[in-house]
Each structure stands twice: as C-alpha cells, then as structure tokens.
Amino acid sequence: MASSDIQVKELEKRASGQAFELILSPRSKESVPDFPLSPPKKKDLSLEEIQKKLEAAEERRKSHEAEVLKQLAEKREHEKEVLQKAIEENNNFSKMAEEKLTHKMEANKENREAQMAAKLERLREKDKHVEEVRKNKESKDPADETEAD
C-alpha cells in the first residue's frame, strides 16, 4: 500500500491519549492482490502414485489401529494390576483385622479366667475363715458350758 492510500484524521486529543480515524482508499483494479485467489492447480497423478498414496494411507490406518490396540491392552493390564493390588490389600486388611480380633478375644478370655480364679480364691479364703471361726466357736462353746455348770 502506498501512503496515498491512507488518510489520517485526528478525532480528539485528551490527557489519556489521542484518537485517530484511518481512512483507506478503495483498491484500484490495476493493483495485483497479495495472495492468489484460487489454489494452485495440482498436477495429474499417475495410477502408480495414486496406488502408493492409498497403500501409505492403509499403512497409516493399520499403524494407528495397532497403536490403539496396544494402548487398550496396556490399559487392561494396568486395570488388572490395580484390581489385583486392591484384592491383595483387602485380604491383608482382613487378615490383620482377624488377627487383631483373635488377640483381643484371647486377652479378654485370659482376663476373665484370671478374674474367675481370683474370685474362687477369695471364696476359698472366706470358706476357710468361716471354718476357722466355726472351729474356734465349737472349741470354746463346750468349755463355756462346763464352766457355767
């Protein structure tokens, strides 16, 4: 574009800046456009070239399909590994919970048995004491009766 194609008109001047209006003159018929209006014509392709392009396209399709299948297989394998790991962790958790519960139940059983043994021992001590008191009383009673007579 030549400088004669553009006109600059000042609109207003402010402290924040200036405003301009640019007026572009219409293009002349003689000027050559910067870009071609139609795409360049393609050369005619031979049957061999067409066949090669079709084979290359088929090869690309097969390669893409193989890549997609490979990715799917990898994804399935990963899913299997994740599932196996989850099952293993679940089993480990179950075993640990079962062992913990068994240990707790054994501790409770031992505690209960110890408490029962302690109660039985106290009862035996009480029976022994009662028997001693009875013997002492019986041994004193006949003596008291003879003295009183």
Curated annotation (Swiss-Prot):
Protein name in UniProt: Stathmin
Assembly and interaction partners: Binds to two alpha/beta-tubulin heterodimers. Interacts with KIST.
Localization of this protein: Cytoplasm, Cytoskeleton
Residues modified to Phosphoserine: S4, S16, S25, S31, S38, S63
PTM (free text): Many different phosphorylated forms are observed depending on specific combinations among the sites which can be phosphorylated. MAPK is responsible for the phosphorylation of stathmin in response to NGF. Phosphorylation at Ser-16 seems to be required for neuron polarization.
Main localization, broad class: cytoplasm
The keyword Repeat is assigned to this record: no
UniProt KW Glycoprotein keyword: no
Biased composition (Basic and acidic residues): 104-143
GO cellular component: a single term: membrane
PTM sites of type N6-acetyllysine: K9, K100, K119
Function text: Involved in the regulation of the microtubule (MT) filament system by destabilizing microtubules. Prevents assembly and promotes disassembly of microtubules. Phosphorylation at Ser-16 may be required for axon formation during neurogenesis. Involved in the control of the learned and innate fear.
Coiled coil region boundaries: 41-140
Positions carrying N-acetylalanine: A2
Gene this protein is translated from: Stmn1
Residue numbers bearing the N6-methyllysine modification: K29
SLD domain segment(s): 4-145
Family: Belongs to the stathmin family.
